[in-house]
UniProtKB/Swiss-Prot annotation:
It comes from Nanoarchaeum equitans (strain Kin4-M). One of its GO terms (biological process) is DNA-templated transcription. The lineage of its organism: Archaea, Nanobdellota, Candidatus Nanoarchaeia, Nanoarchaeales, Nanoarchaeaceae. This is DNA-directed RNA polymerase subunit Rpo10. DNA-dependent RNA polymerase (RNAP) catalyzes the transcription of DNA into RNA using the four ribonucleoside triphosphates as substrates. Disulfide bonds: none annotated.
Length: 65
């Protein structure tokens, strides 16, 4: 799955927040603090970013038939 472009529930654009969110969380920062800093207040948007799993690099390793 690619990073989410919009919230699945309310439709708010989230694509521009994905890279910063992912970088900061991977560095060990608390996801709650990162989401608060990014200005995400709605729980649906927070859920969308928290639950996103990017598997594209894994899929790209397989050859096309």
């Amino acid at each position: 799955m690619l990073p989410p472009i919009r919230c699945f529930s309310c439709g708010k654009p989230l694509g521009h927040l994905w890279e910063e969110f992912n970088e900061r969380v991977n560095k060990g920062e608390d996801p709650k603090k990162v989401l608060d800093d990014l200005g995400l207040e709605r729980y649906c948007c927070r859920r969308t970013l928290l639950s996103a799993v990017v598997v594209f690099p894994v899929i790209a390793k397989f050859k096309k038939v």
